[in-house]
């Protein structure tokens, strides 16, 4: 039947109790500061990292607006 789960026996050979219980120590995980969410979320509770927030501006290319302004007058 389609509604029954078909288990793949090949994966069972790769996973044992020692592998399942193995944990990565917390102090070995190094996350760059720009990848972490803003710790002071006063304006709404966004979970975006600083890098993701900065990329919003580059997605729209707004940082180049001031460079492409035509001269006034003449």
Curated annotation (Swiss-Prot):
Stretches the record annotates as Disordered: 33-53
Gene Ontology annotations of biological process type: anaphase-promoting complex-dependent catabolic process; cell division; protein branched polyubiquitination; protein K11-linked ubiquitination; protein K48-linked ubiquitination
InterPro entries for the chain: Apc13
Pathway: Protein modification; protein ubiquitination
Keywords attached to this entry: Cell cycle, Cell division, Mitosis, Nucleus, Ubl conjugation pathway
UniProt key word Transferase: no
Location in the cell: Nucleus
Superkingdom field: Eukaryota
GO cellular component: anaphase-promoting complex
Stored Pfam families: Apc13p
Family, similarity comment: Belongs to the APC13 family.
Assembly mode: The mammalian APC/C is composed at least of 14 distinct subunits ANAPC1, ANAPC2, CDC27/APC3, ANAPC4, ANAPC5, CDC16/APC6, ANAPC7, CDC23/APC8, ANAPC10, ANAPC11, CDC26/APC12, ANAPC13, ANAPC15 and ANAPC16 that assemble into a complex of at least 19 chains with a combined molecular mass of around 1.2 MDa; APC/C interacts with FZR1 and FBXO5.
Purpose of the protein: Component of the anaphase promoting complex/cyclosome (APC/C), a cell cycle-regulated E3 ubiquitin ligase that controls progression through mitosis and the G1 phase of the cell cycle. The APC/C complex acts by mediating ubiquitination and subsequent degradation of target proteins: it mainly mediates the formation of 'Lys-11'-linked polyubiquitin chains and, to a lower extent, the formation of 'Lys-48'- and 'Lys-63'-linked polyubiquitin chains. The APC/C complex catalyzes assembly of branched 'Lys-11'-/'Lys-48'-linked branched ubiquitin chains on target proteins.
Official protein name in the record: Anaphase-promoting complex subunit 13
Natural source organism: Pongo abelii (Sumatran orangutan)
């Amino acid at each position: 039947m389609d509604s029954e789960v078909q288990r793949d026996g090949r994966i069972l050979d790769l996973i044992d109790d020692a592998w399942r219980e193995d944990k990565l120590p917390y102090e070995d995980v190094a996350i760059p500061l720009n990848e972490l969410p803003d710790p002071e979320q006063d304006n709404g509770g966004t979970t975006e990292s600083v890098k993701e927030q900065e990329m919003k501006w580059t997605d729209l290319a707004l940082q180049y607006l001031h460079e492409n302004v035509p001269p006034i007058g003449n």
